[in-house]
Amino acid sequence: DFQGVMAGLPQQKDALICDTGGGSTELILVRNGRIGGRISLPFGAMSLTDRFLREGERSGNAEQVKAALHKTWDGVPFLKEAAGLSLVGLGGSAVALPAIDRILFEHETVAFSPHGYVIKRNHMDAIVHALVTRTPAERTDELGVEQGRADTILGGILPGYTLMERFTLPQTVVCTAGLREGILAVLQREGIAAAFSDLRAFLKKYETLAATPQ
């Protein structure tokens, strides 16, 4: 993730990366373009949803999740150094945020690229409130959230959102570059993949060679 973010958002030399998947969340502190701390935690969009955020009492359950996450963040020493930095959000839930932001604040649904999209803290407050107060069906109908993500998106964004709360992070910058782009960046930097136009072509050729009898 670190290499992918540095390749996709090279201006983010000082930031806190938050990649929330289905069952895990990875945090990476970036200072002066280098890793200042990292940790992988065993909860994500699906696990938080299954445990706390299924239908019924969404608001109260969301507050329980937020309280638990704040306590977790207090146990990660390097996070104190992230105070005031931008949060770089990765993962499907983070990538869905710009579309919600545009619907809530610009009333637009036209196609656009979410990569590099900046969401200020007050907009994140409004997005979380909009999700908490809607059912999965309403999130799809009113906020444009994909049907397959509507039930888990709140669990997917609460880790990043509570980091913004706890450490006064002013904004979230959405990044669509992740592991694959990071691998490609390393390969290109080392000159290994110079003959290939992208990582997919590189991997496809590698798989073909590996399957060829020697």
Regions found by a protein language model. Give the residues of each.
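Short glycine/serine/threonine-rich phosphate/pyrophosphate-binding segments
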Residues: D1-F2, T20-E26
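A short, small-residue-rich loop immediately preceding and capping a beta-strand
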Residues: L16-C18
